């Protein structure tokens, strides 16, 4: 029995040290050395302080900011610990009700906007955490944001164009706008009706 138990226990402890301690430390060290920003969470800094991550969306509800995709992570929007397959099936009546409710909320926030609502403003991404919207979704919101902030519409549209990321190598992915980065750039603008 000792002849069988001893090698099994030695192997157990050796593999535990290798896979539970040595390997994670080596991978973490390599990540910190080779990709320090990504290893730290791909943080977006403002005045040296983290304001978010480039990988996870945030819940903007103020009409003076651009809004991201709906989060499907339950009562706490953009909760990374609740991420997962989140969209309802296309035949589920609850999906239709949710989309109608989101369209109504968008129309109420900008009653003069008769344009079709872009689909990414009313449906959640697969993870429910997507930080990007389409350029069409940003353009749809531009008039509301300009009006609330007292900015010229053309200035807001220029900002959207400036913050639009193109497909990688010109062919992989879609054009997209990072909502947090767009809102930070928007916050840096001075409204026309601002004092001083």
UniProtKB/Swiss-Prot annotation:
Gene: kdpC
Locations listed in the record: Cell inner membrane
Protein's recorded name: Potassium-transporting ATPase KdpC subunit
Function in brief: Part of the high-affinity ATP-driven potassium transport (or Kdp) system, which catalyzes the hydrolysis of ATP coupled with the electrogenic transport of potassium into the cytoplasm. This subunit acts as a catalytic chaperone that increases the ATP-binding affinity of the ATP-hydrolyzing subunit KdpB by the formation of a transient KdpB/KdpC/ATP ternary complex.
UniProt organism field: Polaromonas naphthalenivorans (strain CJ2)
Lineage, uppermost ranks: Bacteria, Pseudomonadati, Pseudomonadota, Betaproteobacteria, Burkholderiales
Self-association and partners: The system is composed of three essential subunits: KdpA, KdpB and KdpC.
Similarity section: Belongs to the KdpC family.
Pfam families: KdpC
Entry keywords, A to Z: ATP-binding, Cell inner membrane, Cell membrane, Ion transport, Membrane, Nucleotide-binding, Potassium, Potassium transport, Transmembrane, Transmembrane helix, Transport
HAMAP family hit by this protein: KdpC
Annotated GO CC locations: plasma membrane
Domain of life where this protein originates: Bacteria
Keyword set includes Cell membrane: yes
Transmembrane parts of this sequence: 7-27
Membrane topology type: Single-pass membrane protein
The keyword Glycosyltransferase is assigned to this record: no
GO terms for MF: ATP binding; P-type potassium transmembrane transporter activity
């Amino acid at each position: 029995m000792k002849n069988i138990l001893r090698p099994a226990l030695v192997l157990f402890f050796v593999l535990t040290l290798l896979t539970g301690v040595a390997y994670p430390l080596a991978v973490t060290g390599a990540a910190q050395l080779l990709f320090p920003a990504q290893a730290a969470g791909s943080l977006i800094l403002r005045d040296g302080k983290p304001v978010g991550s480039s990988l996870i969306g945030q819940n903007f509800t103020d009409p003076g900011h651009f809004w991201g995709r709906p989060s499907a992570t339950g009562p706490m929007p953009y909760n990374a610990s609740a991420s997962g397959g989140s969209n309802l099936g296309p035949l589920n009546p609850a999906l239709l009700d949710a989309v109608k409710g989101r369209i109504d909320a968008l129309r109420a926030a900008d009653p003069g906007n008769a344009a079709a609502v872009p689909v990414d403003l009313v449906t959640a991404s697969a993870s429910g955490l997507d930080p990007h919207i389409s350029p069409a979704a940003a353009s749809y919101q531009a008039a509301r944001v300009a009006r609330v902030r007292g900015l010229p519409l053309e200035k807001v549209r220029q900002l959207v164009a400036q913050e639009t990321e193109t497909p990688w190598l010109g062919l992989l992915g879609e054009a997209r706008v990072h909502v947090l980065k767009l809102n930070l750039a928007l916050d840096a603008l001075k409204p026309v009706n601002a004092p001083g």
